[in-house]
Amino acid sequence: MYKRQDIFVDFAEENFDDLTEERIEKYRNAPFRAPLIVVLVSTKKDHPKVPEMEQIISTGTAGQNIMLALSALGYGAIWRTGSFAFNNKISEKFGLNENQTIIGYIYIGTPAGKKKSLPEMNTDDYISIWD
């Protein structure tokens, strides 16, 4: 089993040609960016009524609910994916089997400073009314 800081570095060294020392350090420190990281793992199980995509979506929904609960408790959380999610080689380094996929990482901590204000979004860009 790997030490958590080695998983991402080993993967990067095996798969990226243009690695700098700075980038290697970034990957080495990734697991320490927050006091707690929840790794969201979707486990595919053959089921006649629940297709694989619904199983993955359900894991994502569980992750979103975790984030909502954390926010309600005053914690900060950010969901990250990137090269280290939906990646069989990373899943293997975590000791997962072929039916398991990492769909994301939730970094959890106590927010520092004021909450950033976000620009208002026009919901018409995302919602359609079907009459």
Named regions from a protein language model:
Residues 29-32, 96-99, 119-121:
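Solvent-exposed alpha-helices and their adjacent loops that cap or buttress functional pockets
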Residues 70, 94, 110-112:
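Short leucine-rich amphipathic alpha-helical surface patches
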Residues 102-131:
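C-terminal helix-cap and adjacent tail motif
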Residues 35-37, 76, 101-103:
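Structural motif
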